[in-house]
Amino acid sequence: MNVAINGFGRIGRLVLRASAKNPLINIVAINDPFVSTTYMEYMLEYDTVHGKFDGSLSHDETHIFVNGKPIRVFNEMNPENIKWGEEQVQYVVESTGAFTTLEKASTHLKNGVEKVVISAPSSDAPMFVMGVNHELYEKNMHVVSNASCTTNCLAPLAKVVNDKFGIKEGLMTTVHAVTATQKTVDGPSKKDWRGGRGACFNIIPSSTGAAKAVGKVIPSLNGKLTGMSFRVPTADVSVVDLTARLVNPASYDEIKAAIKSASENEMKGILGYTEKAVVSSDFIGDSHSSIFDAEAGIALTDDFVKLVSWYDNEWGYSSRVLDLIEHMVKNE
């Protein structure tokens, strides 16, 4: 499957890194108006969090070469002007963060592209979380969203608990690593004053739509979950805290057993499970969407519990982007 990437930021680069180990995904083109092929090679080779690229890299004026394979590079601002057709592109990963609606993302479809996967939540595109609602994908859907990294962490956990015990209501907090939209030092941020404070020096309360978005992928939970975020000064790996009231009472051990079973069966590779004394950096490079920390959670009563699940908000999410593309291809 010929795939292109629009936007060579954190997710764009990590989708490319992950694809290098996936024989089913053939990245043939990248578009980024601000990055030359020389700089693109450098950005791919060196990564503060994930280390040096494990493979060979080179470039010429119009391509980068990954393990000897040419990847065409475009530098267009407007998706309508990208000549995807010259590289027989079938799928586009839209990872700029700028084209997240059906209308905007659909501009890629004018260039011979069959499908677009938005690597962000969307207000109107069908949204899918692998392991949760991906089976609802239909081949007449040409633009879809892979939701957010936090929704990808929360939704599998919420699905298992809701299917087994029922969730009456819940509040989610994500303790989230720094992202590119934050300021390294205090700077102007008109809409979110706290978000303009230095990311390296503060714990910053922030809003997130991730919990409410779970209601889109699990309709039975619509209106039952909401949440907020704390941005913290770490480079990667975040953690979800889901505090929920259950419909059917259950001991914490019963909840652990249900999640462990799902992690070994229907959600294997999506939902992980650990009872070890882990910390955030232990999950750098973990490809699961969500790793349940059995020893970190607590229960006040049999129907009021706090569940904790980790996620590499970069690598895990990028891995799901490729999984969603694979699923779409199989259902054509």
Curated annotation (Swiss-Prot):
EC numbers: 1.2.1.12
Reactions that this protein is recorded to catalyse: D-glyceraldehyde 3-phosphate + phosphate + NAD(+) = (2R)-3-phospho-glyceroyl phosphate + NADH + H(+)
Site (Activates thiol group during catalysis): H176
Annotated pathway: Carbohydrate degradation; glycolysis; pyruvate from D-glyceraldehyde 3-phosphate: step 1/5
An annotated GO BP: glycolytic process
EC class (word): oxidoreductase
Entry superkingdom: Eukaryota
One cellular-component annotation, GO: cytosol
CDD domains registered for this protein in UniProt: GAPDH_I_C, GAPDH_I_N
Catalytic residues as annotated in Swiss-Prot or TrEMBL: C149 (nucleophile)
SUPFAM superfamilies per record: Glyceraldehyde-3-phosphate dehydrogenase-like, C-terminal domain, NAD(P)-binding Rossmann-fold domains
Gene Ontology molecular function: glyceraldehyde-3-phosphate dehydrogenase (NAD+) (phosphorylating) activity; NAD binding; NADP binding
Binding, D-glyceraldehyde 3-phosphate: S148, C149, T150, T179, T208, G209, R231
UniProt keywords, alphabetically: Cytoplasm, Glycolysis, NAD, Oxidoreductase
Ligand binding (NAD(+)): R10, I11, D32, M77, N313
Compartments (UniProt record): Cytoplasm
Family that this chain belongs to: Belongs to the glyceraldehyde-3-phosphate dehydrogenase family.
PANTHER family linked: GLYCERALDEHYDE 3-PHOSPHATE DEHYDROGENASE (PTHR10836), TRIOSEPHOSPHATE ISOMERASE_GLYCERALDEHYDE-3-PHOSPHATE DEHYDROGENASE (PTHR10836:SF130)
Subunit details: Homotetramer.
NCBIfam families per the UniProt record, alphabetical: GAPDH-I
Name of the protein in question: Glyceraldehyde-3-phosphate dehydrogenase
Originating species: Phytophthora infestans (Potato late blight agent)
